[in-house]
């Protein structure tokens, strides 16, 4: 509990906004369930949880004294963060589920999925900001920029693996062999590389826009 409160107060204003927006998103789903008598789209709650994981990790990492913590711990946190950060941006692809909606429900679902995608994307950008702050204490600004673009492209690849290949972060534990084989195939595919780079550019420019707005 103390750990959660510490992270909450670390950036209280932002976390308050995230909390209120999360309540709004959950309320939207409950309203939809009441209207349609269906729990369809409730998978968005799980996707949102996965989007929060890298944000929590990067917030915790930012609170650490990197000079006085074991490198193994720091590298482990960074590895877990890299595995989960694509989940933050992945929710935007859930717009594909609008194909199953029509009439009034289509517009309601558009608002719901867009709301979850917005908070997920925002969490991803905030997490990238945390990473950039830490990164610039280790390497030059030039190399930090290159690294962030590479991570954005890796996020694009992660989205490809999740949306097209239909794997998720937990398959690393539950289905590692098939995952590794399909990752190797995808890594040598022009289609997946194009997909990854395009999503990477999209994420990176969104990050730059957010960065330039908040720096004013």
Language model segments and positions:
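Juxtamembrane non-transmembrane "cap" segments at the membrane-aqueous interface
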Residues: 156-177
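N-terminal membrane topogenic signal
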Residues: 3-20
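Membrane-interface transmembrane-helix boundary segments in multi-pass integral membrane proteins
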Residues: 42, 168, 178-203
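Transmembrane alpha-helical segments in integral membrane proteins
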Residues: 122-135, 197-216
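Membrane-interface helix-boundary motifs at transmembrane edges
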Residues: 7-11, 62-73, 133-143, 216
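Central hydrophobic cores of alpha-helical transmembrane segments in multi-pass inner-membrane proteins
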Residues: 47-63
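Short, hydrophobic transmembrane alpha-helix segments
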Residues: 30-42, 61-66
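Hydrophobic alpha-helical membrane-insertion segments
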Residues: 78-86, 147-162
